[in-house]
């Protein structure tokens, strides 16, 4: 009589094989360019610049000119077409921050006032908004996006008082 019991090693091997075969289609599937999100960034200096770099996949720092001390050449700077997402608009009250970020995302519209940004862009052009402004403007920069029924990533704190929190809650 043969035993139907399997060893622990056989069990783990068959379990690992099943897990790999089930996950394989997700690993091999490539992302369609049409699947990119159209994002708006309000506040692109400091923390906002970090958020922009992280989400777009384009580091906002210039490569070393002439290579490093070992003679290796710096890699070419990524272009906006290499971005993980479509950056459709950049907004910052500081012109220097805005100009610097715009160099890395030349196709993005630029604004110095988020109210003009919301007045100019149509809801259909925006898939999401990232708010990284100074703390006292978070709620006011977030509210119009929520009224457009767009998802928002906002740095903390979202609000500074109960009245702002109630407005945001009602809009969401």
Model segments located where?
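Rossmann-fold NAD(P)-binding glycine/threonine-rich loop
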Residues: 158-172
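ADP-ribose/adenylate-binding Rossmann-like module
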Residues: 149-161
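N-terminal glycine-/serine-/threonine-rich beta1-alpha1-beta2 phosphate-ribose binding loop
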Residues: 2-151, 166-170
């Amino acid at each position: 009589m043969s035993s139907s019991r399997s060893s622990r090693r056989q069990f783990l091997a068959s379990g690992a094989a099943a897990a790999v075969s089930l996950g394989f289609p997700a690993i091999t599937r490539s992302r369609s360019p049409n699947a990119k999100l159209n994002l708006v960034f309000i506040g692109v200096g400091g923390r906002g610049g970090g958020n922009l770099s992280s989400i777009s996949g384009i580091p906002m720092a210039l490569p070393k000119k002439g290579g490093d001390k070992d003679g290796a050449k710096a890699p070419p700077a990524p272009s906006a077409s290499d971005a993980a997402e479509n950056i459709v608009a950049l907004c910052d009250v500081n012109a220097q921050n805005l100009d610097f970020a715009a160099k890395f995302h030349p196709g993005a519209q630029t604004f110095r006032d988020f109210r003009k940004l919301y007045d100019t862009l149509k809801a259909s052009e925006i898939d999401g908004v990232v708010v990284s402004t100074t703390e006292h403007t978070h709620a006011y920069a977030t509210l119009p996006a929520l009224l457009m029924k767009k998802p928002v990533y906002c740095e903390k704190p979202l609000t500074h008082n109960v009245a702002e929190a109630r407005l945001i809650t009602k809009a969401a």
